[in-house]
Each structure stands twice: as C-alpha cells, then as structure tokens.
C-alpha cells in the first residue's frame, strides 16, 4: 500500500506536465477572459516559474516533513499530504477555469502549497519501508518499490490524456479526487511497522526497559549532513534530479513542440521514459545487491546516460526510435535516481555509525531528496530560458553536463566501494549493501 500511495503522489504531479499546451492556449486566447500573458514566450516562462515554485516548496517541505516524520506516526503524515495535495491541485487547475479567475499570483501560491503538501510523502514512505525490510536484498526490494514513482507517472500520463478531451480542468479535479480516496485507503490499510515490533516496544515501555539502541533519538539535520556519504549523494542528487524532473515536467511539451504531435499522443508516448525508469530501478537494484555496492553501478549508468541523451537529442520524429531511446534515457537517468532516493536513502539512514537508530531514517531521506529538489528548482527556470534562447538541443547538452557533475560528486565513493569489491573477487567475503566501516570515509 505504500507503493500505491506514493504512486498516486506522482500521478497527481504529472497533471500539469500533461496539459501544458492546453493551459498555455487558455492563458493566451480565451473569449471569456482577458489573456493572462501577451505571448507564448511569457506563458512558457511562467510555466517554468511554476515548476520551480513547486520544487522550492517541495525541497523546503522535505526537510521539514522528514524531520517531523521521525517524531510522528508516518502514516498520518502521508495521509495529510494526500488530502492537502488533492485540495491544492483542484484549487490550482480546476478552480480558475470553473470561475474564470485567472491570476498569476494565485497560480504561484496554490502551486507552492501543492509542492509543500507533496513533500509529506517520500520521507515517511522510506521510514515505513525501512521498518518492514532489512538489509537482505535491499537493492532489489527497494528497486522494485521505488518503481512506484515511474509507475505513478505512467498512470498519471494515461489518466490525464484520457480526461483531457473533457477539459484540462477536469484532469486536475479527477487527480485531486484520487488523492483524497488514496488518503482514506492509507489510513485504514498501512501499518507503519510490523506487529511484532510494536508489541516488543510496548512490552519494553511497560517494563521500563525501552531500548534506546533500537529507537534512539531523532537526529538533527546538521548531524545528518555530516554522516558518511550523505553530502556526496546530496550533491549528486541535486544534479541528477534536475535532469530527471526536467523530463518529468517538460517531455510532453517538448514532443508537442519539436515534432508537432498531438498533446494526447505526446502524453502517451512520454510513458516510455518512465518505463525505462522502472527497468533501471529494478534491474539496477538487483545488480547492486549482487555487486555488494551501489556507487560503481550508478556511475556506470550515468556515463551511459550521457551518450543516450546525445542520441535522443538528435533522434528525430520517428515514433518507434523515439520511444526506444526515450526508454534508454529513462533506464540511465530515472533508474539511478530511484536507486539514490530509495535504496541508498535507507543505506545511509541505517549505516553502522547510527547504531541502529530508527529515528534517523526519515530525516536522512528527506535531506537527500530535499537537496535534489533544490537543484531541480533551479533547472525548471533554466529549461524554458535556454529553450527560448538557444533551442531544445541546448537543453540536452545542459543535461549531459549535469550528469557529468553528478558522476564527479560520487566518484570518491565509487573508488572506495570498488576497492573492497575488487579484493572480494578472490576472497569472496560477505559484503554490506552499500557502506563499509572504513575509518577514512568522509
């Protein structure tokens, strides 16, 4: 059910991405109201501003909700975010159309609040998954589970394209309604931790022997940043999430403008990027379990992403080839992103230095995804500016540069992971999933 709930989170985010052409046309040319913008350039720039506003609020919210998720029942945090997201999505996209109320400040405010509510989900979802699953096959388990993000995108793309002929405002309303239904399902079906863990904690509390070694104290954000490996992956994710979310926000519009395809066709074709993300997440998690380390695999995938981005930028309007290389880009961009925010979040939040402190997980995952969202916020402003000034090709070169920087951020971690892995080929000792107890690690 955790995968179901976060899939709905992602599905609701996909709404604006799938209707940008319709929304732009409504802002520019409508008999019922004065045009909100004077040119398509202004409208597109404002769309980038909205995406950036969402990511800024989302990044800020991740730090807060991650901190709060270690102090409250994570199920309640998830449900609160779903209710708030459903309400804000309807107010943002449906309310202006229904009541002919078009105001730029109103759009920014409601989308900021939507981003803040969306941030409730991920840290608490990760905390729940960490309670239910241990180290065994963590890469594969979390790879499968983290695929709920691209699966949610796929569902959101299809659902939005299906509703779009009835009016883009109804796409916002129906996705908002799904979030409200999902919140109810979460409240009645999710257990934050296994029953035996709850019984054990209750027994310890009744006998006055509460185990601080298991629960621990909630960790401070600054202390979380200084944990081994956290800062490197935060910086890596700031670059990688910018690229991943640029595809998330702009891919349907790119397909519509670059190849003059219908908006519904572009929405449906864009799912191949998310299908690639599912493949990369699941297969990457499985391979990383077999390798006994994560960073070398992520570096290899990111190196491949640079070539796949270059090819995709020049692939042309042939739908089959476009879909194929879009899938390859999804494998090499969305795949490692899912591994970082999923599997590696748990690895970093449960490393030996924390002494099994279960109260650190949500904070660490919120920090990791929050810094990624901060980087992504910058990207959503850069994309329309670069596209308007230099064309779409320049945007893809920006993506290649950012993925190169992402590689640099974790190269030290990669080298450290490779040393014991290479030595293990001959000796075959038992390996930890990600983190080694090396004293020189930073």
Where are these regions (language model features)?
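Symmetry-related core transmembrane helices of the 12-TM Major Facilitator Superfamily/SLC fold
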Residues: 170-188, 394-413
